[in-house]
Amino acid sequence: MSYLIKNGFILTSTGEKVQQDIRVEGEVIQAIGHLEREDGEEVIDAKGLFVSPGLIDLHVHLREPGGEKKETIETGSKAAARGGYTTIAAMPNTRPVPDTKEQMEWLMNRIEETSSVRVLPYASITTRQIGEEMTDFAALKEAGAFAFTDDGVGIQTAGMMYEAMKKAASLDQAIVAHCEDNSLIYGGCVHEGEFSKANGLNGIPSICESVHIARDVLLAEAANCHYHVCHISTKESVRVVRDAKKAGIRVTAEVSPHHLLLCDADIPGLDTNYKMNPPLRGKEDREALIEGLLDGTIDFIATDHAPHTEEEKNETMQRAPFGIVGLETAFPLLYTRFVKTGEWTLKELVDYMTIKPAEAFSLPYGKLEKGQIADITLIDLNKEMAIDKKSFLSKGQNTPFDKLTVSGWPVMTLASGKVVYEEGRLVK
């Protein structure tokens, strides 16, 4: 199929808005400029729309296999398409875990059969993610593993992490870490701060995360491994990563939209839709995360999309599972909060959600250039609408942002040159 995307505006390398047309043939961008329709082309009128590279989210929980009541590869990828994402990376905390070549091959086939967008599957670092025995990295890489992580739990022993890093480095693969020292969790369900004290809840201290990162960056230096920090959340963690980068250690980090937008003082009552891991931290932590993103300490934004059933989230704050959904709301939330207010440029936000994650993991995506894969998202920056969790394509409706009015909604998504979402409907 050939498309000519007409009359939209793109961003130059300096952030200037310019009107350009884009010709897509098959999976590839063939031309960008002032173009006329050719025979057989379908014209997409993008007048008044921002034409962005397809968004990239390298931290998503699709729950399949084993958690299909919460989400599936099909429903999660539909949610991604609606949110403007063309590439997502699926975490391995499923049942069974993708810890063998056979399980990874099954997962790759399932992705091919049911996904609307590109899904990059993580493999687990340890068998069943219990931290005792390392998986066969080489076999998993051959079967399609994108990188290695035990996300959802931290690798508790330095020896296991060091061996994993050495093996990953030998295969030119990344170790992606959920940073949490179990001995410092203390049964917590929210951040250790004023909110936890006021509500009589066990709190998770900031040191639980930062001490793990401090250990791991030194191991990564010794192993010469690409080490990536998931969902960084504390000011101390930002300081550790900043110092590690200054020392030349190959470390990258991501931050989730909710940690940029909220702190624990924003939690209304005991609403479990504000419960995630890591938890919403203090105001100073949120400010440090924003500063770290802007100065390059933190590399990109990832949603940590974590769907749960309504029944699960109706439990108490102590008992309800951690996690919120984010694929369908991330761009408009961040655009409204940071770009419309003038704190960030549009280019900064788009880079954090496209080229920056691609560069961090050497992926050939995230650019609008001739010859590139045609991953393209059309966004109506002026479209203002209230978030409605009942309209989500994800099975999960666990969001703290329901009914919030925001601007900057994706209206069409092309993945590898195919229209996979058009406002109001999924295209398969």
Curated annotation (Swiss-Prot):
Substrate binds at residues 61-63, 93, 277, 308, 322-323. Coiled coil: none annotated. Zn(2+) 1 binds at residues 59, 61, 151, 304. Its cofactor is Zn(2+). Keywords: Hydrolase, Metal-binding, Pyrimidine biosynthesis, Zinc. It is an enzyme of class 3 (hydrolase). Binds 2 Zn(2+) ions per subunit. SUPFAM superfamilies: Composite domain of metallo-dependent hydrolases (SSF51338), Metallo-dependent hydrolases (SSF51556). InterPro entries: Amidohydro-rel, DHOase, DHOase/Allantoinase_Hydrolase, Dihydroorotase_CS, Metal-dep_hydrolase_composite, Metal_Hydrolase. One of its GO terms (molecular function) is allantoinase activity. Its EC number is 3.5.2.3. It catalyses: (S)-dihydroorotate + H2O = N-carbamoyl-L-aspartate + H(+). Belongs to the metallo-dependent hydrolases superfamily. DHOase family. Class I DHOase subfamily. Catalyzes the reversible cyclization of carbamoyl aspartate to dihydroorotate. This is Dihydroorotase. The gene is pyrC.
